[in-house]
Amino acid sequence: MLKEFQEFALKGNMVDLAIGVIIGGAFGGLVNSIVNDIIMPIIGLITGGIDFSNMFIQLAGDPKTTLAAAREAGATIAYGNFITLLINFMIIAWVLFLVVKLMNRLKKREEAKPAPAAPSEEVLLTEIRDILAKQQKA
């Protein structure tokens, strides 16, 4: 049973998947930082200083000025967080689209290289005839 598990865990696809998950996690953190630390402040500046992380609709309780306070007081719809996560998702989806497109292009290049055609029977017989003719002349 241990041997079966070892074969399963060390298969090429399993290791590739593990590496992909680790890199994906790191990439997700990088995209989060890009969105929260670079893109959203620029969008906030363009839109007149709007802080998307603090945009919400309070459904219950006394009106609050921060999302954290509003969540403590009752139900909220944090649409600012949704906008941030949507931008985050779009960046990740775009990068994955580009990676898949690149992989498909590389696969097509590999498939496009035709294997050398095997010589036909006629070509082989012609070559044999020519060799025999040379041997008879010599």
From Swiss-Prot:
Which pairs of Cys residues are joined through disulfide bonds in the record? none
Domain of life (superkingdom): Bacteria
A Pfam family this chain is assigned to: MscL
Task: Give TM segment ranges.
Answer: 15-35, 38-58, 80-100
Keyword terms: Cell inner membrane, Cell membrane, Ion channel, Ion transport, Membrane, Transmembrane, Transmembrane helix, Transport
- Could you tell me which SUPFAM superfamilies the record lists for this protein? Gated mechanosensitive channel (SSF81330)
Gene3D superfamilies, from UniProt? Large-conductance mechanosensitive channel, MscL, domain 1
- Report the GO molecular function annotations: mechanosensitive monoatomic ion channel activity
Keyword Membrane part of the UniProt annotation: yes
- How is this protein annotated for GO cellular component? plasma membrane
- Classify the protein's membrane topology as the record does: Multi-pass membrane protein
Q: Chief subcellular site?
A: membrane
Can you say where in the cell this protein is located? Cell inner membrane
Q: Which InterPro entries match?
A: Mechanosensitive_channel_CS, MS_channel, MSC/AndL, MscL_channel
- Describe the subunit structure: Homopentamer.
Q: What does this protein do?
A: Channel that opens in response to stretch forces in the membrane lipid bilayer. May participate in the regulation of osmotic pressure changes within the cell.
Name the family. Answer: Belongs to the MscL family.
Q: State the protein's name.
A: Large-conductance mechanosensitive channel
Which species is listed as the source? Answer: Brucella ovis (strain ATCC 25840 / 63/290 / NCTC 10512)
Annotated gene:
mscL
